[in-house]
Amino acid sequence: LHPRVRRQRQMCIRDRVRSSVRHTNMLGSIQNSMTVMTEINYLIPDYYSKFTCIADRCPITCCQEWKIGVDADTNRKWKKLQAPETVPEQKKNLSAYTIKKDGQRVIGLDSDHRCPFLNSEKLCRLVVAYGDKVLSETCTTFPREEHRFPTHNEKMLMPCCPAVIDLWNKQKSLHFPNVSDTLSDTGDTDTSVLFLLREKLLNLLDDSSRTIEEELLESFYILQELYQHQPLTKELLEDYFSDNTVRELGNAISDIDLPPLDLISECNELLQDLSVNYQKEGLYQDTLNPILALAEEISEALSDSTENPDDTKSYESTLLEQWEQFTQYLSPYEPLLRNFLRNEIFSDLLLPDSDLENVLVQMQWIALEYASIRHSFFLRWMLDGTDANVSEISYETLRQYLVILTRMTGYETADIYEYLENSFESLLWDWGYFALIIGN
């Protein structure tokens, strides 16, 4: 399924940074928590209630090129309903338009990978005919997401909707609820300390005086240290995330050379790996095919050093200059990307039944997602610069790739584990590999 099994690169960061961080034991697991509040609380970020579907004005419809789930209750209802006359291909009932795919009942897409109920005005034929109540749970809730913990429920929005990206782009910084404060009142310290860890990471990634990359590298290093020196306590978290510890850690990391060419080469592979199945199914071709062709071209040029060393050296020099220019043009979007990453931390880092290993795995996936998205920006920027002498990155282009790549990487937890286990020598990465794809 994932053909490239890459060897992790070893880097000697741990010995150089370890002196910056004191080691104490820690523990944390939600799965053994039996505390239940008398009244379930719904905790939401500050942006959640501001979302509105823009329907026919949406530039990247959610009714095309991905699986649209149909729950059992909806499917039973659809067996008794006829398709509106405006649906091009008439079948005996609405359920007849569904298929089983990867163990899930979904709407069967047409030859253009579009939902058969989507009309030319990008409106749903079912809603026009029957109203919103006819829709499946997926269509009703997207892009909303809910996680149900034993102690409370959390709601958030997913980034694979352009209207969500527009919402985040208008806010300088997103604000998330402090769940640990709520849980500390219940006396459930094992659970609250994991949520406190998440809050510490959210705060770390909210410091605009430093780069996203620096903060991701520090975050993953701290997570690895905590994982290796369990059990987890509130006091230990305060120590690891203290201003002095983070400053010393940042100084140590900044002294390490992380060659951009290695990053570009590895991110080329990552992006191609993630795209394999989508290419086979003919999905997102307009978005993916141009940048994947350039990724392949870059990979071939970088691997051609033995036959044409002078040409390769010149190519590498030009590529480095382009990367440096790109990072400058990307910097105006750092607030948006920071909002995106912090939302990923809030929504995906800590799931029901999580422990510290799960948190590490989820952080790796978030990093892989970010590295692939950023690399898709880079490749598209190179193509646009070649085609039209464009230097700046347009917001519409950035939004397009952010939406499509997050749709591509929106795996369920079991699928994330399968992908990482099939693609890497070990489920848990060395810090060096994390640093390789993130850079500094």
Model-assigned labels for residue ranges:
Residues I212-N440:
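Hydrophobic, aromatic-lined core segments that form the binding pocket/scaffold
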Residues S19-S20, S29, S33:
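Serine residues within intrinsically disordered or low-complexity segments
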Residues L1-R16:
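Single conserved hydrophobic/aromatic residue that forms the stacking wall/gate
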Residues W66, V127-G131, F149, T186-T189, ...:
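Conserved aromatic-histidine-acidic binding/catalytic patches
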Residues A163-R247:
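Charged, amphipathic alpha-helical linkers/stalks
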Residues M34-K122, L126-S136, T140-V179:
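N-terminal cysteine/histidine-rich coordination modules
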